[in-house]
A protein has these predicted regions:
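C-terminal output helix
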Residues: 109-118
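Two-component/phosphorelay signaling modules centered on CheY-like receiver
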Residues: 14-32, 121
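Active-site beta3 strand of CheY-like receiver
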Residues: 47-53
Length: 132
């Protein structure tokens, strides 16, 4: 890829943030990182990433609060958000989808596999719709 594609990783775990940043770079993404929900929302407004990978469980402002804030803001409402979670309960996932999550990825995950998933999903979102 000739140009880095901006994505945002919001996770309170520094090891996960840095690992995702390195993994995503292998697939042509430039990952901006935020260590908490508030800084993540602000960074999303500033950088306009093409994707957001959002941890569900964080202190102060959890992933669902961040998701709600992003989806109720004209500047960020159209950015696809993938929840990173170890919560596999159907009710939890339904709530995330109701708020506006586009997909979810369960922890633990393989970093290389995650990079491939994000690249594939990004290509799907950016492909022009077939007409007729």
């Amino acid at each position: 890829m000739s140009k880095w594609i901006p994505v945002l990783v919001i996770d309170d775990d520094e090891i996960i943030r840095e690992a995702l940043k390195r993994s995503l770079k292998l697939y042509g993404f430039e990952a901006y990182t935020a260590e908490n929900g508030l800084s993540g929302v602000n960074l999303a407004r500033q950088k306009k990433p093409v994707f957001i990978l959002l941890d569900w469980i964080m202190p102060e402002m959890d992933g669902l609060e961040v998701l709600s804030e992003l989806k109720h803001d004209k500047r960020t409402e159209d950015i696809p958000v993938f929840m990173l979670t170890d919560r596999g309960m159907i009710g939890d996932l339904d709530l995330a989808f109701e708020i506006g999550a586009d997909n979810y990825i369960t922890k633990p995950f393989d970093l290389m596999q995650l990079g491939k998933i994000v690249k594939t999903k990004w290509e799907k979102y950016t492909k022009p719709a077939k007409v007729g």
